[in-house]
Amino acid sequence: MSQVKVAVRSEEAANSYTQTFGMSWRQWRQACSEEYAKQCEREVLHTVDFIRENEKDPERLVEVVDSKIYDNDGLVHEVCVSDKATGKANKRSIVYMHGYGAGLGFYFRNMDGLTKGVTKDFNSYFVDWLGMGNSSRPPFDIKGQTASEKVEETERFFTESLETWRIGHGIEKMILVGHSMGGYLSAVYAMQYPERVEKLLLVSPVAIPENPFASNDDAEVYNSVASSAVHAVMDEPPLSNVTNEVLQTQEETTGLEPSRPSKPKNPLPRFITFLWEQNVTPFSLLRLSGPLGPKLMSFWSSRRFSTLPPETFRALHNYCYSIFRLKGSSEYALGNLLAPGAFARRCIMNRLRMLKCRTIFMYGDKDWMDDVAGLEATNRLKEMNIEAEHHIISNAGHHCYLDNPEDFNEIVLKEIRMSLRSFSSISE
């Protein structure tokens, strides 16, 4: 049976994985090419038995592909898992999209469980968004002047590239899974191309609730309900969503260490808001840090991936740094789509009527994302006679697919089985 190794590290061991200055310097000098980033991705994928020794797997064929969608800077990077015996033809498709600034390699703990016994009916695609991961990094040149124009143009950058990729693969309809910002963009894709999405699985999606701090500069102006929320928030501001993403450890999210209570924080400092509005991303700061970059990032990675065994941790750290270091591209979408603090400039909640397919919301029980908004969206969809479900995954944070792959996989596999039963009944 293919497995991914799991180990629990002590706090002392976890701290030992922060890099020395010498290690940081060496990695900085090495991590400056697309080939290095792909090599690091291979090292992550090869921690999975059936991928590392794919020739021995009797069922699944693993292909790493760069699909050309545009003439210039238009390669979309993917891992496809299909059936060795029958190939890809006449199969249904399930497509997994990663979150902001990440890459398809983040799904490495899910690839075995999500594809074993599935390839006879489904081709599984793990895809890097254009401008992220190991896909091409075209210039991100948004010409819109108003916030609304920037949102629309930025959303089209992602949805049109995904649609062009779909057409190139001859996929008629797909189950679409998206995490965080990838969930937001997947939802927008489903709104723009409803006939192409069979089901929508949103994994801790950003941009669901209204922005209580919205102003006339944003794509939508806050209403009276959101306005009242401002006062509630300002009475006792919660820990910043963005801050939580940096500070939460994997021990906390997986239940191996008690969660620290959130401490009230003031709204984001003005200089952070200024940097956000100027599209200064975390990755641009990482690039500017030069030889210190890998060491600085190791403070984050040693916390975020703190329960993984040493070799897996190192592979994932190297992978993250290698793709973060590549030329900036669609990472600059952040400030166009989200206001400072990670609220949407144009939220999904106010566009739910455009969704036409069964929609699943998933959150970790220690998620910093607003799962209550996901529950409200679920209820609103049901009121519109759209099938919807809301799931909380135990012992997991924002990256619930990574923290608790077994429970996450089971929810996805349930939806796959339901689709197969529905398809069989229609065929009969």
UniProtKB/Swiss-Prot annotation:
Alphabetical list of InterPro entries matching this protein: AB_hydrolase_1, AB_hydrolase_fold
Placement of sequence motif GXSXG lipase motif: 178-182
Motif (HXXXXD acyl transferase motif): 398-403
GO cellular component: cytoplasm; endoplasmic reticulum; Golgi apparatus; mitochondrial inner membrane; mitochondrion
Chief subcellular location: mitochondrion
Coiled-coil intervals: none
EC number: 3.5.1.-
Annotated family: Belongs to the peptidase S33 family. ABHD4/ABHD5 subfamily.
Protein name: Probable cardiolipin-specific deacylase 1, mitochondrial
